[in-house]
Design a protein with these regions (language model features):
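Basic, Lys/Arg- and aromatic-enriched nucleic-acid-binding interface segment
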Residues: 1-41, 49, 60-64, 84-85, ...
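C-terminal secondary-structure termini that scaffold catalytic or DNA-interacting sites
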Residues: 2, 72-88, 93-98, 150-153, ...
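Short, contiguous acidic/charged loop-to-helix segments that flank catalytic cores in large enzymes
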Residues: 12-16, 57-67, 93-99, 114-120, ...
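Short, polar N-cap/turn motifs at the start of nucleic acid-interacting alpha helices
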Residues: 45-52, 116-117, 136-159, 180-186, ...
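Hydrophobic, well-ordered secondary-structure elements that form the walls
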Residues: 70, 128-131, 142, 174
Length: 195
């Protein structure tokens, strides 16, 4: 369940797991992205000025470009990853061969090293549950954060924006939750009263 994630993150950060694996797994949890999206992330996809990770359409399951807002902790992870940068463009290269880390590497880190009885993909489900159960964000905000295609054809035809401001706020709250500093941000709806 998502309640356990702050302690999992803390254990991950203190673990003796290799630095690329540790950083990739935390980045995956913070971004709520798919394993292959994170493991194949390239430096050329990062725009620190706009605080965005721009995943090209050809790497997305939905075949649509996906923009992921970078939180403060995600930027810190990227700074740490620069120290292990090899001659290629990968953010999280395998220290053994410079190629992307394998899906199995993250699975073993989570299940064997951290003793978490969950899949890496289950981290995305935990994000979705957290968003649904503890926030007031509309369902489509978390769906867009997960990079899901809009299944309703009419809505898809009219949806032009990517809800970036709301997604950025959601991901900041997710980061706060994961860090154990769950700053509950209360959103008030003020009704205009005329006398």
């Amino acid at each position: 369940s998502f309640d356990e994630l702050p302690s999992i993150i803390e254990r991950l950060q203190k673990s003796q797991i290799s630095q690329p694996t540790k950083l990739a797994l935390e980045f995956l949890i913070l971004s709520a992205c798919r394993t292959t999206e994170v493991l194949n992330a390239h430096w050329s996809e990062i725009d620190l000025n706009k605080e965005l990770w721009i995943i090209p359409a050809e790497r997305m399951k939905s075949s649509r470009r996906h923009e992921v807002p970078l939180t403060k902790r995600m930027v810190e992870i990227l700074e740490e990853a620069k120290n292990i940068k090899l001659d290629n463009n990968l953010i999280f290269p395998s220290p053994l061969n410079g190629r992307p880390l394998s899906n199995n590497t993250l699975r073993l880190a989570l299940q064997k090293r951290l003793k978490v009885p969950a899949t890496v993909h289950g981290m995305r489900a935990a994000f979705k549950d957290w968003a649904a159960e503890t926030t007031n964000f509309a369902n489509e905000v978390s769906e867009m954060a997960l990079g899901h295609a809009i299944s309703n054809k009419v809505e898809a035809a009219y949806r032009r924006g990517n809800l970036m401001a709301k997604r950025r706020q959601m991901m900041e709250e997710w980061m706060q939750f994961l860090s154990g500093h769950d700053a509950k941000i209360v959103r008030l709806q003020i009704k205009k009263v005329t006398l």
